[in-house]
Amino acid sequence: TPMRSSAASDVYKRQILGPTNTGKTFYAMERMLSHASGMIGFPLRLLALENYDKAVNVVGLNKVALITGEEKIIPKEAKYFFCTVEAMPVEKKVAFLCVDEIQLASDLERGYVFTDRLLNARGEEETLFLGSEIIKKIIQKLLPDCKIETRPRLSTLSYAGVKKITRLKERSAIVTFSIPEIYRTVSYTHLTLPTIALV
């Protein structure tokens, strides 16, 4: 794919690597709001929506846009854009641009979109890619001038052993590995737990 953005080599590009819960998204939000305009592409609609809500609370409803495959909220005065990666209006010029979970460039179904953003999407002043360390060598080959920072996990994640679903505490996570298992778990937990979110 040819480089669309004249991928300015003078644009400050960074890659922040680390596992979940290392403060990468919080850092990206702080960086974006320090610029006059910005855009962040998230891998999930729920992440775009959650961070859109946070930004609205900080800078106000009129300055923040939400663009996903399902909904578009774009005020006339919008300066900050929260999008799914596929829905990012990359032709729009912004000072800051960020793509979250950039390692999804290796995904068989959605990877082409993340790869396109990695190669072509740039902020005019700063570009930030967030992801796990598995993408590090690819970034170094494709973007040799990209500064790479690694972050440690802010809390511990540990296996608590086998638990009955009926005895789960609030804010527990259930991880399943197939679509049928997901729906079976959700239908069962709806009977025993008052609220549940499926991500």
State where each predicted segment sits.
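Inter-Walker segment of RecA-like/P-loop motor cores
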Residues: 58-90
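Loop/turn-to-beta-strand initiation segments
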Residues: 79, 93-96, 124-128
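Conserved strand-helix element at the start of the C-terminal RecA-like helicase core
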Residues: 38-47, 169-186, 191
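Post-DEXD/H (motif II) to motif III coupling segment of the RecA-like Helicase ATP-binding lobe
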Residues: 107-155
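Walker B catalytic acidic pair
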Residues: 100-102
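Walker A/P-loop
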Residues: 13-26
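Single conserved hydrophobic/aromatic residue that forms the stacking wall/gate
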Residues: 1-4, 8, 12, 190, ...
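Walker A/P-loop NTP-binding motif
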Residues: 25-37
